[in-house]
């Protein structure tokens, strides 16, 4: 009975949020910019949440968590939905948890990026870790479910089709850009059957870093933006010219969202390639994004998944957390 009452309350909150957002309309792509429902340019700056299922298990998927993200200055949060976690907790329970999360995000004035968080080669169903295991059938099912469930939820503004495509990891098979482009277009077409308004985010290879193929063979669908994950060790310093050649040039024509950035010191918890750096990277990447009008979310608003933004569940900022909290709050106040 208590569960029924709770779900009725969640449904009521979501209905109210939907009514409010319907009056505002959807974020859309115009040229190389995101535009809010009032016609103003919108730059997304926010935080990557770890998997909703993980956070439920940790007892941290709650309003306090979302309120803290908003207090840091985020205007967007990213839900990293791992296929194996979705199946472990169950689709119904996971989506019910995300319903509540979307209501909290809307309450605190934040948009949501829905991220199908797998790493590897979707064409050949070969992945870098069992937690990312999925296939095309399940991927289409996920996006049908998202598009149907949230077709009246403009808070869920961005659909990140596939987290990190790669064919250079061990045993990840083969896939050309033309093949991957076609798969992404099929997923977008599936989404658009149920929700023609959502902006779809498309990534390139090399763990979603490389967007060079977009120069000659862009995604042939409207209302799309591109993703890159320019962690500090993807290229050696000086970074800017290489960033421009690898992904930044795309922002001259289409919106770009770097849905994962971040760093940690060499001696900090979880330090690994390609994230080891200092706040020198933080200064360079944020200055570059401002110059190019690139949106971003920082990985990861969690105590375990590195590079972490927080050291504990009192939300004590880590080294990168101190840098990005100050930066986000400054931008939010402008």
Region spans (language model):
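Sec-dependent N-terminal signal peptides
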Residues: 4-14
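N-terminal carbohydrate-binding accessory modules
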Residues: 17-76, 205, 326-331
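Extracellular glycoside hydrolase catalytic/binding regions
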Residues: 26, 58, 137-158, 162-295, ...
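Acidic/histidine-rich helix-loop elements
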Residues: 42-64, 84-90, 127-131, 233-236, ...
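Residues embedded in well-ordered beta-strands within globular domains across many folds
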Residues: 46-48, 78, 160, 201, ...
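Feature marks short, surface-exposed loop/turn motifs that line or immediately flank catalytic pockets
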Residues: 51-53, 80-87, 120-122, 165, ...
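Aromatic-lined substrate-binding rim segments of carbohydrate-active enzymes
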Residues: 61-123, 138-140, 180-195, 274-293
């Amino acid at each position: 009975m208590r569960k029924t009452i709770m779900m009725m309350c969640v449904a009521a909150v979501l209905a109210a949020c939907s009514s409010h957002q319907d009056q505002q309309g959807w974020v859309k792509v115009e040229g190389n910019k995101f535009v809010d429902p009032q016609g103003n340019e919108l730059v997304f700056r926010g935080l990557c949440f770890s998997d909703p299922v993980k956070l439920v298990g940790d007892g941290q998927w709650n309003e306090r968590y979302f309120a803290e993200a908003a207090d840091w200055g985020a205007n967007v949060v990213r839900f990293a939905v791992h296929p194996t976690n979705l199946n472990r907790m169950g689709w119904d329970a996971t989506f019910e948890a995300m319903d509540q999360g979307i209501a909290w995000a809307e309450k605190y004035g934040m948009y949501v990026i829905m991220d199908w968080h797998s790493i590897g080669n979707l064409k050949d169903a070969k992945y870098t870790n069992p937690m990312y295991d999925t296939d095309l059938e399940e991927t289409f099912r996920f996006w049908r479910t998202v598009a149907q469930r949230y077709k009246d939820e403009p808070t869920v503004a961005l659909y990140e089709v596939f987290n990190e495509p790669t064919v250079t990891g061990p045993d990840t098979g083969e896939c050309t850009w033309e093949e991957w482009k076609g798969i992404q277009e099929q997923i977008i077409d599936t989404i658009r059957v149920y929700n023609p308004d959502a902006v779809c985010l498309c990534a390139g290879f090399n763990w979603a870093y490389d967007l060079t193929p977009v120069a000659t063979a862009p995604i042939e669908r409207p209302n799309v933006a591109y993703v890159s994950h320019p962690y500090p060790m993807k290229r050696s310093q000086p970074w800017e010219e290489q960033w421009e050649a690898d992904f930044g040039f795309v922002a001259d024509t289409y919106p770009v969202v770097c849905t994962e950035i971040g760093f940690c010191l060499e001696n900090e918890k979880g330090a690994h390639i390609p994230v080891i750096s200092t706040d020198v990277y933080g200064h360079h990447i944020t200055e570059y994004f401002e110059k190019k009008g690139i949106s971003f979310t920082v990985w990861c608003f969690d105590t375990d998944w590195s590079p972490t933004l927080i050291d504990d569940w009192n939300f004590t900022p880590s080294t990168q957390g101190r840098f990005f909290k100050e930066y986000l709050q400054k931008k939010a106040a402008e």
